[in-house]
């Protein structure tokens, strides 16, 4: 039994360390904005910056089909069908 506890402890410890060593991400897992190399950067550095900036913009502006927030989905489901009849109190006015 002590061997099983030690094995479980090592597994838990390694999982925690693996989670702590993840690279930092921006909000909601978005990539970090590339750092401008400065006005005196070489053409190669500027080309690399332009490529990184293009990738960054493409990641932020890509369409996310079917990736709605659960809160938004809950609100939409509460609205009901757009073809449903209006409540009586609204129809009497």
Swiss-Prot record:
Annotated propeptide span(s): 89-93
GO molecular function: neuropeptide hormone activity; neuropeptide Y receptor binding
GO cellular component: extracellular space
InterPro entries: Pancreatic_hormone-like, Pancreatic_hormone-like_CS
Compartments, as annotated in UniProt: Secreted
Extent of the signal sequence: 1-29
Keywords associated with the record: Amidation, Cleavage on pair of basic residues, Hormone, Secreted, Signal
Record-linked CDD domains: PAH
Origin: domain of life: Eukaryota
Modification type Tyrosine amide: residues: 65
Membership in a protein family: Belongs to the NPY family.
Protein name (record): Pancreatic polypeptide prohormone
Species assigned in the record: Canis lupus familiaris
């Amino acid at each position: 039994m002590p061997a099983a506890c030690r094995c479980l402890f090592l597994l838990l410890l390694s999982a925690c360390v693996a989670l702590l060593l993840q690279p930092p991400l921006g909000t909601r897992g978005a990539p970090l904005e590339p750092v401008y190399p400065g006005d005196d950067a070489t053409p190669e550095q500027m080309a690399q910056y332009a490529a990184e900036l293009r990738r960054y913009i493409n990641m932020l502006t890509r369409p996310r089909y079917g990736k709605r927030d659960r809160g938004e989905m809950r609100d939409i489901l509460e609205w009901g069908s757009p073809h449903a009849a209006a409540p009586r109190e609204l129809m009497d006015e």
